[in-house]
Amino acid sequence: MFAFDGFVPVIHESAFVHPQATVTGNVVIGRDVYVGPGAAIRGDWGGIVIDDGCNVQESCTIHMFPGVTVHLERSAHIGHGAIVHGARIGENALIGMNAVVMDNATVGAGSIVGALCFVPSEMQIPPRSVVVGNPAKVVKQVSDEMLAWKTEGTALYQALPARLRESLHPCEPLREVPAGRAQHEMSYRTWKETRT
């Protein structure tokens, strides 16, 4: 965490910001927010508001032009490697892995922006839209079933901060896999798997 120009980041005690993430300046992070390693959240030229229940995954960048405020509304889900630059992301919207959302764009509530999508400046995406491509194009509406699936995935990230605070710690690696090593249980399925 870094103060800048008199602005000190504000991070709710229930949030988890990985030690390898960088949060700078005029940033406000709400309850149960997850920020992954390698994320850069730069409130140096403007403000960044990350509402309760959002997640900003590994290697994401959030930034803006001078004087702009970036707002991630409640339960927004920013996938691995995505860039949000000077945009507004609506409540319970998902930005897919390595997608880019540019200045003054708005992603409507409950929308899903596909992986590798490029949302150009000023684009206004209506609520509950599925958006793909470069440049981005709305291809269909988010069904109730798809929204429930997305919300379930975000809930996993909303539970993660408490689990990380409880059990994440530096360690020395083992040199071999021990007998009887525990396995992770399957607690979520891909969209395709839910459809079959």
Language-model features: where?
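A positional/architectural concept
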Residues: 6, 11, 15-64
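Glycine-rich hexapeptide-repeat left-handed beta-helix
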Residues: 1-10, 44, 52, 58-60, ...
